[in-house]
């Protein structure tokens, strides 16, 4: 079900101290937006209504967090949830930011200087209706290569999903993008790790009897990347001289 337009969302976000109003202007300087810029930076890609971010960020004031989603009508809900969580913890929200961004264009908003130590991807769109849409998955190699550019070797990506096909495909995506899977489970709640924070979606799927799949992947050296963009692969496979060299000019 599509979420209705919320006319109050943008004005309320613009009045929020931890909302990044012009995210396109901060490439190379994201750390400077925080009260303690030398702290590690962790991203949640597709933060949705903020159920995960609002739990995690107040627990770790020694880490800076950025929650990203594409629309204000979703982000406004995250803003309110984060505010309530910090108020309950009696803490200032000075280690958390939220921003409206298209994650598929992340490389145009961040630079390698914006060192990201960890990324969380929780219950993202599986894009499973047809094979051509798979490239939009947040765990597809073309996306993972964007994240790699921001992350030092050894940094980690935490991924959770209810979708079987997305998870199985992701088990191939991560290694192809040079990310070693160091831990995985097809039933997160069977032996739930202490670090897991259940989101609204997670609770809903669990109540329906749908197992939650999860993994942790660690960025390896650039030499471990095996995936090649299809257009680039075609270029590499084309004989020297192009089509003329392959079979001559017809006609």
Question: Where is each model-derived feature located?
Answer:
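SAM/dcSAM-binding transferase cores
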Residues: 1-38, 181-251
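Class I SAM-dependent methyltransferase "Motif I" SAM/SAH-binding loop
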Residues: 46-50
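Conserved SAM/SAH-binding beta-strand->alpha-helix loop
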Residues: 71
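Short alpha-helix immediately C-terminal to the canonical SAM-binding loop
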Residues: 75-77, 167
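S-adenosyl-L-methionine
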Residues: 80-113
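A short glycine-rich, Lys/Arg-flanked "PGG" loop and its adjoining helix->strand segment in the class I
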Residues: 138-153
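Conserved beta-strand signature within the Rossmann-like core of class I S-adenosyl-L-methionine
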Residues: 154-161
């Amino acid at each position: 079900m599509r979420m209705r337009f919320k006319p109050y969302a943008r004005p309320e976000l613009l009045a929020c101290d931890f909302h990044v109003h012009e995210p396109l202007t901060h490439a190379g300087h994201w750390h400077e937006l925080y009260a303690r810029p030398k702290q590690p930076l962790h991203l949640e890609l597709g933060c949705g209504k903020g159920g995960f971010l609002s739990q995690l960020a107040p627990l770790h004031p020694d880490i800076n967090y950025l929650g990203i989603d594409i629309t204000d009508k979703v982000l406004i809900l995250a803003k309110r949830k984060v505010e309530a969580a910090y108020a309950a913890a009696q803490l200032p929200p000075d280690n958390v930011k939220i921003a409206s961004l298209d994650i598929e264009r992340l490389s145009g908003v961040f630079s390698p200087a914006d060192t990201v130590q960890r990324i969380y991807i929780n219950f993202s769109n599986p894009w499973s209706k047809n094979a051509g849409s798979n490239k939009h998955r947040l765990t597809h190699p073309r996306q993972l290569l964007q994240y790699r550019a921001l992350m030092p070797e050894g940094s980690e990506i935490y991924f959770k999903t209810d979708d079987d096909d997305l998870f199985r495909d992701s088990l191939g995506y991560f290694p192809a993008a040079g990310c070693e899977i160091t831990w995985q489970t097809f039933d997160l709640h069977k032996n739930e790790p202490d670090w897991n924070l259940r989101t609204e979606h997670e609770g809903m799927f669990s109540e329906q009897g749908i197992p939650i799949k999860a993994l942790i992947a660690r960025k390896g050296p650039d030499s471990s990347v095996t995936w090649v963009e299809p257009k680039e692969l075609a270029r590499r496979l084309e004989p020297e001289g192009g089509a003329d060299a392959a079979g001559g000019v017809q006609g």
